[in-house]
Regions:
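Polyanion-binding surfaces on beta-sheet-dominated domains and ring/shell assemblies
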Residues: 2-133
Length: 133
């Protein structure tokens, strides 16, 4: 086997196949999550709405997630419960943002919540849209 073929073989066998299959199955079933919260001049799907939509399907497909702060970065980890395979991403949370009428702790909490929503949505391939009902 040539070196390049061996590297390709090793890479393919190191892929988190169980996680990828479970994630693909999850993505086929997860609904569009409606944006039902308004704030700061725009409409968005809040974390409770996202959790309500994804948690039963994540359990069904053997998936879980964690979101932990690592210094000023948010680590989002999507994992396959049985195999332990995981994907992770990091998002740096800006520290120099100021919002009118909010103290530094409120701004930090708002930023963390904002990044949690978007990091989780991105990692899971979620789609959010305005509720037209």
């Amino acid at each position: 086997m040539k070196e390049q073929e061996r590297e390709a073989y090793e890479y393919a066998n190191a892929m988190p196949r169980n996680l990828f299959k479970a994630l693909a199955d999850f993505q086929q079933e997860v609904p569009v999550i409606h944006k039902g919260t308004t704030g700061y001049g725009y409409t968005y799907a809040d974390l409770p709405a996202i959790f309500e939509a994804i948690n039963p399907l994540m359990k069904k497909h053997g998936l879980g997630f964690t979101q932990l702060m690592q210094g000023t970065s948010l680590e989002t980890r999507i994992f396959h419960v049985e195999s332990g395979e995981y994907l992770q991403s990091f998002a740096d949370i800006p520290q120099d943002v100021q919002l009118k009428g909010m103290n530094n702790f409120q701004v930090a909490g708002s930023a963390i919540t904002y990044f949690r929503r978007y990091a989780l949505s991105s990692a899971l391939g979620l789609v959010t849209d305005k509720d037209t009902d």
